[in-house]
Amino acid sequence: EFSLTSYTFENIVRHVLGETSPHYSLDRIASWLENGSAVMRIRGLRYIVYRAKASIRILDRTGVITRAAELAKVIGIDFNAVLTRGSQFRVESLMARIAHPEQFILPSPSREQVAQQRAAECLPLVLEPQSSYYTDPVVVLDFQSLYPSVMIAYNYCYSTCLGSLEDIAAGPEAAGTHDHSRHRLGVSSLDLPPGLLNALKEHITVSPNGVAFVKPSVRRGLLGRMLQELLESRIVIRDAMKRWGSDNAVLCKKLDAWQLGLKLIANVTYGYAGASFSGRMPCVDIADAIVQSGRETLESAIRFIHSKHAQWGARVVYGDTDSMFVHLSGQSRESAFRIGQEIAEAITRMNPAPIKLKFEKVYQPCVLLSKKRYAGWMFTSPEQTEPLLDAKGLELVRRDGCLVTQRVLEGTMDVLFRTNDLSLVKSYVTGEITRIMRGELSLQEFIIAKEVRLGTYSGRVLPAHAK
């Protein structure tokens, strides 16, 4: 909901309601009510009533109850389960309703079966960024819902998987059985009738990691059906929000809760298949197929962009799972928007539906430091004149540092992007350090807030926040 450095009642009230709330300890309130004068008892009661009313206002402002109720309706689970159960329960609830009419039963593997399946072998592509300060435009392109789209496009599902070609060739020894028609698949084994692969050889898709799946012409996967319905429903809901949301705030909140719930379910479906430690129904063959297909999709897009260097002058300087940062040397910001759209449309045409590359934004200028650490002035449309500072992974947006670090870094970025003059950056930072040394800043700016996980730290010396 809100990314805060501290989740005390007073801090939440300040950020959500824009009010300043006094802080009284429970001991003090108890002493007012039990031993205090009439005035102090009234003060204690007023504070308790204020906290109760403020809590209700926070719930209303954040829409927690509305979202949970609408999500329960969409998924088909009870209200309490939305708040207390995890994402696997939600995926399974939807999948069970789709599987039942098809007369499929969802297996329930034991912890031993989950632990005995082979380890995952495939990793998403995360390129080492070409760390630099870029004054020319950097276009950010993102594959929209990459893993759900891959599962739909290639029909990856429990109900369509024939297993790894390597395991099929290895025979019963790999599956731990003496039945020569069975081979290993995820946490269990699969019985393939003799001659089935031969009969289906024209109707099989082999994933990049060597796992065979039947095409939709033979059987449409349950996961693909579920995801396609989720994504299509979300598009319809978002269109309805644009059409009627501005005239009806209550309806807009309800529709937004629906589309957010559908998005969350679609995004965690891969995790349901890949949860190899605590999963309810993991299948490493399917999970690896999804990851490796996504990796090859991104690699293919990068190769295509580099092959068109003469046309666009584009070079991929960073890539992470489903997104690319494309540097356009010598191009204007207006040209960057045009070229970015051309790249997105060309790569979308290369891939089967519904895999789609989406043009996200343009950074100019931009600093790439390392993996998942960058910042830049963001433009989302050619008409935008005032940039927005966008950052990821830096102390500027992290919640485990102090306010003075965030403020100074934000000011540093502003001076650098506005002037491109390192001497002015140095002057600004020197001035801030001088103010710190003179004690001109509030002590609140130096408070470090970091999550404490007692029992997880090694060594004799605990970190400062755990003492």
Where are these regions (language model features)?
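Common nucleic-acid-contacting/processivity interface regions adjacent to the catalytic cores
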Residues: 33-155, 162-165, 171, 178, ...
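Secondary-structure transition/capping motifs at alpha-helix termini
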Residues: 65, 161, 244-247, 276, ...
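Active-site-proximal helix-loop-helix substrate-binding element of RNase H-like nuclease domains
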Residues: 1-53, 176
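Catalytic cores of large soluble enzymes that bind and process phosphate-bearing ligands
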Residues: 1-5, 40-51, 87, 138-139, ...
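Short, surface-exposed acidic
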Residues: 19-29, 160-163, 315-317, 354
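Short beta-strand
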Residues: 315-320, 359
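Catalytic nucleotidyl-transfer cores of nucleotide-processing enzymes
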Residues: 1-4, 112-275, 372-395
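C-terminal polymerase-core module
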Residues: 325-467
